[in-house]
């Protein structure tokens, strides 16, 4: 009894969950996003942030229903296999894991990049961390060290993790808010938004969509899955998963939109007249802007924040990625030793060590922030394509399952989120779409090796449940290749008719995806998890009375 009480007390409450969510959401994205978005789209970039929030919010809506039905660690690596079998489960989990394991080095790279531009005299040796815009050999050692520290903070217990991220989250929220106040007081010029449609949208309407994916806006918002992947470690998950996602996503959206507005209105007119929005070249955008406006103390604080903010995100994602890898092992298509949990602290230590090694390999191969960001965005969006089809298939296959959060307008939201995820992949522009296919191809031989070891048991059925997404990704890549010049295609389909084609094709494949589900051993496992969750709810209800 005492042991159960201790385990319950060790679980994450709502306030800790919101701070953990914000710790993941507010990382290097806010430090780069506003500048990147305005350089692509100009003042209309503010609409790109609203659009990014709507895209991710719509996708998250599907996952809240599934996440509350199956509260488990690393949940997002399991959902697709429950309805469509192990191959689709593997594709979704592989894409999700690739995106998550790449967030660990991108945050370390971001911290090191800002360290290299610290203005203090004693920090001069830090300049050797960067070389021609990429991490140098010395910089790599610093990145490795930061990845090790991220991992060590996750190595002992959930309590240590939440204590650390709660402390950092308070700082991460405070500095952007202070930045907003000081920059608005020092330079607030609403005329920077322009006086007509042509000055508000200096580069046309297409960059509104391009900025949503290409400037790191989707990347900045997609961390809502941190909360879902912590599943079984959350107190009252049936209520707190939905609340945690809604609160942390909404707070971060408001913060990001105000930051973008502050960046636009604080920009000196002389600089805009000289180079235009797409000619502004900052190394550390908000710190450089603070120096331009003569607020040197704020610039120094921002240099410190630029180290702390990615640090908090990196720590959060080591926690999530370890649990995702452990969940993938239950699929039976990656080595069993990765599933091992530390009995005392209930932490997947082997998975954490393995992810740290992979993170180091990734950053050795891709040494700049932009390349790592491209890998994250495309892989994440592929994983998200399976959410809407899974939640609809579950409604058909398990109508009597307990749903603590039942999405009310799912028949609209599921196809809408599938279409939006498809468009967001297209907005990433050619050739990023083709790189998604490569990421999946790299994973498939691992899957088929384990199918071979299992004597190809039910392999034909698994392919039948998953072929639609493989074909769809190839079709999306072809559409990106022949699409409009605004999205780096051959311009065989002109803008905005390319969007109409994507929407129609997406709805066709969405329908095929929802009708490709079948009952398997994984669905029976899902039924057991849901039954256990219902019993837990009933027991809690009885004890409260």
PLM regions and their residue ranges:
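Helix-loop-helix junctions that connect adjacent transmembrane segments
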Residues: 3-9, 46, 51, 122-137, ...
């Amino acid at each position: 009894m005492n042991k159960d009480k201790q385990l319950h007390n060790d679980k994450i409450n709502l306030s800790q969950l919101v701070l953990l969510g914000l710790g993941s959401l507010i990382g290097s994205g806010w430090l780069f996003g506003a500048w990147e978005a305005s350089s692509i789209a100009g003042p209309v970039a503010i609409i790109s942030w609203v659009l990014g929030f709507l895209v991710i919010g719509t996708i998250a809506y599907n996952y809240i229903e599934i996440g509350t039905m199956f509260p488990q660690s690393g949940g997002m690596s399991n959902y697709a296999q429950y309805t469509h079998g192990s191959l689709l489960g593997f594709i979704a989990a592989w894409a999700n894991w690739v995106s998550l394991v790449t967030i660990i080095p991108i945050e370390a790279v971001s911290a090191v990049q800002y360290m290299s531009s610290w203005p203090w005299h004693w920090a001069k040796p830090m300049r050797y961390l960067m070389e021609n815009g990429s991490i140098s050999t010395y910089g790599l050692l610093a990145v490795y060290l930061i990845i090790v520290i991220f991992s060590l903070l996750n190595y002992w217990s959930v309590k240590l993790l939440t204590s650390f991220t709660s402390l950092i989250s308070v700082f991460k929220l405070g500095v952007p808010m202070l930045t907003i106040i000081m920059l608005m007081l020092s330079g607030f010029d609403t005329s920077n938004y322009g006086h007509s449609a042509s000055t508000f949208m200096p580069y046309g309407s297409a960059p509104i969509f391009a900025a949503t994916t290409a400037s790191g806006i989707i990347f900045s918002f997609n961390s809502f899955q941190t909360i879902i992947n912590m599943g079984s470690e959350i107190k009252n998950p049936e209520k707190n998963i939905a609340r945690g996602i809604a609160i942390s996503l909404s707070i971060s959206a408001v913060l990001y939109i105000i930051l973008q507005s502050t960046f636009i209105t604080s920009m000196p007119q002389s600089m805009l007249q000289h180079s235009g929005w797409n000619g502004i070249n900052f190394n550390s955008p908000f710190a450089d802007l603070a120096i331009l406006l003569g607020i040197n103390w704020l610039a120094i604080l921002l240099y410190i924040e630029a180290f702390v903010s990615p640090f908090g995100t990196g720590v959060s994602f080591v926690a999530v990625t370890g649990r995702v890898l452990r969940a993938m092992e239950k699929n039976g298509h990656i080595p069993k030793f990765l599933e091992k949990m530390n009995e005392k602290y209930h932490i997947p230590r082997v998975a954490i060590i393995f992810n740290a090694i992979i993170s180091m390999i990734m950053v050795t191969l891709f040494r700049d922030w932009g390349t790592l960001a491209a890998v994250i965005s495309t892989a994440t969006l592929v994983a998200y394509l399976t959410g809407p089809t899974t939640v609809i298939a579950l409604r058909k296959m398990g109508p009597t399952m307990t749903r603590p959060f039942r999405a009310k307008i799912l028949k609209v939201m599921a196809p809408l989120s599938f279409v939006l995820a498809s468009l967001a992949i297209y907005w990433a522009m050619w050739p990023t779409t083709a790189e998604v296919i490569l990421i999946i191809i790299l994973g498939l031989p691992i899957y088929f090796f384990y199918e071979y070891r299992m004597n190809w048991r039910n392999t034909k059925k698994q392919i039948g449940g998953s072929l639609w997404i493989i074909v769809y990704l190839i079709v999306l890549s072809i559409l990106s290749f022949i699409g409009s010049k605004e999205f780096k295609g051959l311009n065989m389909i002109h803008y905005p008719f390319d969007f109409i084609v994507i929407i129609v094709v997406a709805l066709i494949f969405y329908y095929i995806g929802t009708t490709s589900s079948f009952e398997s051993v994984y669905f029976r496992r899902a039924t057991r998890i849901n039954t256990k969750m219902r019993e837990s709810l009933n027991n809690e209800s009885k004890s409260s009375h």
